[in-house]
Amino acid sequence: MKKTAFYKTAICLVAVMLMCIKISGETSTLQAATATQTAKSAQIVPADSPEAAATEWPGIRTEHKPGTRWWWLGSAVDKENLSWNLQSLHQAGIGSVEITPIYGVQGEEARDIPYLSPRWMEMLKHVQNQAAQLDMIVDMNGGTGWPFGGPEIEPAHAASRQLVQRYPLEGSSAATATISSTSSSSSTTTTTTSSSSSSSNSKSAAKQRINLEVQDKRQQPHAQLQALLFVASDGSREVLPLEAVKDNILELPADKKGELIALYCGKTLQQVKRSAPGGEGLVMNHLSKEALGHYLKKFDRAFEQSDASWPNAFFNDSYEVYGADWSEQLLEEFRQRRAYDLRLYLPELLGEGDPEIIARVVCDYRETIAEMLLDNFTVPWTEWAHARGSQTRNQAHGSPGNLLDLYAAMDIPECESFGCTNFDLPNLRVDEDIRRNDGNPATLKYASSAAHVSGKNFTSSESMTWLTEHFRTSLALIKPEMDQLFLNGVNRVYYHGTPYTPKEAAWPGWLFYASILVNPNNTIFRDMPALNDYIARVQSFMQSGKPDNELLLYLPIYDIWQNYRNSNYLTFVIHSMADKLPQFDGLVLELREAGYDMDYISDKQLSETKFADGLLQTPGAEYKAIMVPHCQVMPPATLQHLLRLARRGAHVMFLGSVPQEVPGLHKAAERRDQLRQLWQETGLKTDLHSQQSVSYGQGTLTVAPDLAQLMKTSGIEPEEMKSVQGLDYIRRRYDDGYVYFVAMQHNRSVDAWVPLAKPASSVMFFDPLSGQKAPAPMSRNEENQNLVYLQIKPGQSLIIRTFDQGNLSGDTYPVFEPGNVSYGCRKEQRNQEALPLSGNWTFEFSEGQPHIPGQFKMKGQPRPWTELQVEGADAYAGTGVYKLEFKLPKVQADDWLLDFGFLAETARIRINGKDAGLVWSVPYEIRLGDYLLPGKKNSIEIAVTNLPANRIADYDRRGIKWRIFKDINIVSVFYKPITFDV
């Protein structure tokens, strides 16, 4: 593990000049301001001003603050330490905790509290009382570890799997043959043994005796025979009655020749992962409403017998119910939902036979599984929570369901950032051996799309999972990942997360294997309030108004279900989302690069969409157009509704071609004819591969092979801040204007007039990092577009608030350019843009470990403290203070910028004895003009805080035992053993 250092480049003061924004007619020019000029020259004349409150920062509410997953290791908690943990989080700016009990700590078994026991509920009640005093929100996991399950789940309610045994029948009339299977998979080999029989047996009495005993010994106590299909040698099929089986033996006439397929409902036997005491046991069957009802009874009992309140929300983690591809009720539910008997198509379900029939049967199976998960788990679980005054927060990814429908059925859809994104931001330290982020923008948008379309107020995220190796997560690295979440519609972030730790526990305290360690044992925790204030400011804007993405993008789920090969069981795991529908994933990124934003929509959600007042209207948002991208397979009902919307005035666009195939097997030819008939009614030529557009009722249908040409017909104006300047953005509609959150997530800067796609009478800028706000410099171009002057460096972000009416008065948001600094150097006078802070620095170790006394001198530029020749310096974790006295030249400057270049990791600044701010994110710079004395001697103190990496490396080098946790204990981002002694 590399040692963390202080900096790599010289610390410099940069003189900056305010730029005067000169507006003349419809053209805009820039000129440097003199020292006496200020931004007042760009003042907007007051007119009917918007409400004053709209130009202020929103008041911060609890839900604006970030939350954190709070792991209770072994539930070995006590009231005193619970209070200390909560108070620490509150002081750091955390607004919500989600209690998730997990495995325990070695040697602390006496402190463990069984899940939902009276003692556990007493601890929950204490947390709720303390949280109420601190104005914090308390959520809780719907189980321990993940997925849902535990000791009350017996095999009858446990997660289930397909189990198939196959028996070749040779057909014999000479003797009674006993046939048995030797394994329990779909590719089983079989053996045939003949039992003795007397010569007096007649031909008609000869039987084939099939031994149906399950060969997998682990499954024998649980497997339930569900179907017997005889496939004759001529291809004919017969479903045999289960009643014919006696003591695991099925007798068939000796002359039957072909194959017998036996289908069982087996059990995955998966245990709850990372379970806490009292939560150990089998994983429940998420496809069974009966199993869910049985599972939830334990919560009803625990809360009825306790004074604890029901939590604000119950949480369900990503779907990791491995291999649960069956359920006792599946055959019957399939028959009711798909209108045919799946038993007759077991070979196709197993991937054998006509490829088209295989695809259609597998599609029907996948759709049925998806509906069962929605109808038997997600919806009733949410209804159960509502009946108790709670909500549901759920991660649908990883499941076999239609993610959009699952997310829409819960109260707070939650996505997940997993790994580290390569943003290519200057001076941002990113370790080489890191796991790349699987939660790319196209994947993150499933949760927020469902929230927007269905009208949910919040989209949450499990944030920063495996962002770095342990002890390596900087605030600077967190910020762009958070910005990426905001840009994709997340407005309620939860850290991953906070291990509960007793105050008296030896450092590094109690740890969770995939945590970024949001607690006081992390050195950087002292500066987390700055990050959390930033998050709260952003979320205060992003939780208000309505989404304004304008384009609906149809998710061609049936193309995936019907055409995606591999096994019949298909899940949407975050790590491989792009593999399932790469064209769709690529299209989303291409649209966004072109300056557009969108929400995805499912067939079910589309059926609830209306067209009125010139817009497509869903329960939660309004849109200008809908696009069906590269879709081959579509139910006639979906196309029928699209055409209904077009007749009423909607613009429906098809990219590439139009869908001409229907999903599923039942009455496929009849439904295909319905689809063709619908196309014939439109007048579109479905075999034409060039752009075409037809009027349809009051609306328009457009087909185009080229995305850019298609979007020109959409009536949607792209945002040039993205397509030209490279700024990422998300936009929300307020009653009196719009709100943009913009961020530069690439290695480029913006210093230009930038048009807004939405009209505005006036604009405010809000800087969520500093809390600064002011009216925006505005102008118009030749196309009469609103222009605002944006000056944004890599890593920076901004909130843009527009108003439909009224003008704003006051100094506009400052725009700076570097100025020249004249200073003496060996009788010479040099003019430079930067003044290096060099001289006689002093340094001392402040708050941290190990304790290192004394003051150290550094000449010239300050050096990393790891270079000091003093025992313990290379193991130190905490804060060190650098001090310097220097004379500031008396030059013409409107402000001064302190530029660190590189910083590891945060720096608190004091100028002339006054707190001047905290530097913690890229670019590592801060304005100091209000604190400096031009032409006089000044003092600067820089309190730098590093990460715990050096200290934990020292622990490993010295063999100190700190890995004291059960289950998985501590592993690397790749789930491999790891030491930090390098």
PLM regions and their residue ranges:
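Aromatic-lined ligand-binding clefts that engage carbohydrates, nucleic acids, or primary amines
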Residues: 755, 886-912, 919, 940-944
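Short, surface-exposed tryptophan/glycine-enriched loops
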Residues: 926-937, 943-948
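Acidic/aromatic-lined carbohydrate-recognition and catalytic surfaces
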Residues: 102-187, 201-242, 252, 260-266, ...
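Mature N-terminal segment immediately following signal peptide/propeptide cleavage
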Residues: 49-96
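Extended acidic/polar, glycine-enriched regions
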Residues: 216-304, 780-833
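Carbohydrate-binding surfaces of carbohydrate-active enzymes
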Residues: 82-83, 96, 113-146, 152-153, ...
